[in-house]
């Protein structure tokens, strides 16, 4: 019975790892395509709009994050003792935190940009921010850098505490599995705390966009008869983008919370593989949501698909 259970776990883990590899490749293609299209447009026009800058920076940060995951998983599987040394735990935890933090905050800046550009409020504070979208985005990124510095500082303090606790028992440069797991849980806890800030900010923009759409719809019912106007359509498109971001981001956060609360399951390879698949869905699939929403990216993707479809005829 134990042999059958182990065999089932092994098969499940292998299937999940294959799915993970496919997810990483899909994410690299989507984010690489986004960055390439905007960079080519920048070279052609000699300028880049704010939203394109955010999209390019977001895609670039996710490419780095996905490559880090793609390279890191095989190394951790083939050389498990290497990744549990003091230096490697600090290096990989810090690098993952930086890559993920930057990726999440650029996506949050995109939500803030959509809100300020599309929402319609008459109060003076909103109009003041609306006229200074670039400054608002710059300040948001500056705040994210301060939080990143605090996150890394707290992260290294927790890792050092974990290392010192282990050294009191057995002086060695290698973590045994229990203390390696304990260190990972502390890293996750710290990361979840700092991720709550962009979650609250994105959720606030989402709720304010809904309120703006509701007030606009109410005004239209009083003065205009007919279907949607351009502003209403823009509201719906912005809401779709923010909903997709919040949905994928919520799944990502729930995965981290699950790993934090049920940390005993992190000893099970299938559970680790499952969490990695869920974590990777956010940076991989969100890029395709942005491609479908952006007219330039959508047209470029259709051109590439058309070229790929016609290519076999040219080869013949």
From Swiss-Prot:
Tell me the domain of life. Eukaryota
Signal peptide (UniProt feature, chain positions): none
Q: Which SUPFAM superfamilies match?
A: Family A G protein-coupled receptor-like
InterPro entries the UniProt entry points to: GPCR_Rhodpsn_7TM, TAS2R
What are this entry's molecular-function GO terms? bitter taste receptor activity; G protein-coupled receptor activity
**Membrane topology, Extracellular segments:** 1-14, 84-94, 157-191, 263-270
Task: Show which residues sit on the Cytoplasmic side of the membrane.
Answer: 36-62, 116-135, 213-241, 292-316
Instruction: List all annotated glycosylation positions.
Output: 170
One Gene Ontology term, aspect cellular component: membrane
Q: Does the keyword Glycoprotein apply?
A: yes
> What does this protein's UniProt record list under function?
Putative taste receptor which may play a role in the perception of bitterness.
Protein name (database record):
Taste receptor type 2 member 109
| The organism of origin for this protein | Mus musculus
């Amino acid at each position: 019975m134990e042999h059958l259970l182990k065999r089932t776990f092994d098969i499940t883990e292998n299937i999940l790892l294959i799915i993970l590899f496919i997810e990483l490749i899909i994410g690299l293609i989507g984010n690489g395509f986004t960055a390439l299209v905007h960079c080519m447009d920048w070279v052609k026009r000699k300028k880049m709009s704010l939203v394109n800058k955010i999209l390019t920076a977001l895609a670039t940060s996710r490419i780095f994050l996905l490559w880090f995951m793609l390279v890191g998983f095989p190394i951790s599987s083939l050389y498990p003792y290497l990744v549990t040394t003091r230096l490697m735990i600090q290096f990989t935890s810090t690098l993952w935190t930086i890559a993920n933090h930057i990726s999440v905050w650029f996506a949050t800046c995109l939500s803030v940009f959509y809100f300020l550009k599309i929402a319609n409020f008459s109060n003076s504070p909103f109009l003041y921010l609306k006229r200074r979208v670039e400054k608002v985005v710059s300040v948001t990124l500056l705040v994210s850098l301060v939080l990143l510095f605090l996150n890394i500082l707290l992260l290294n303090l927790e890792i050092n505490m974990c290392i010192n606790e282990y050294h009191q028992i057995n002086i060695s440069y290698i973590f045994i599995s229990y203390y390696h797991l304990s260190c990972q849980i502390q890293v996750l806890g710290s990361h979840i705390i700092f991720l709550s800030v962009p979650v609250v900010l994105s959720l606030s923009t989402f709720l304010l966009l809904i309120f703006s759409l509701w007030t606009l719809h109410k005004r239209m019912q009083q003065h205009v008869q007919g279907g949607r106007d351009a502003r209403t359509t823009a509201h719906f498109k912005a809401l779709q983008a923010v909903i997709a971001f919040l949905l994928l981001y919520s799944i990502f956060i729930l995965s981290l919370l699950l790993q934090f609360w049920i940390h005993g399951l992190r000893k099970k390879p299938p559970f680790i593989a499952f969490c990695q698949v869920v974590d990777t869905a956010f940076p991989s699939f969100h890029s395709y949501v942005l491609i479908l929403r952006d007219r330039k990216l959508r047209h470029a993707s259709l051109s590439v698909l058309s070229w790929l479809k016609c290519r076999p005829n040219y080869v013949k």
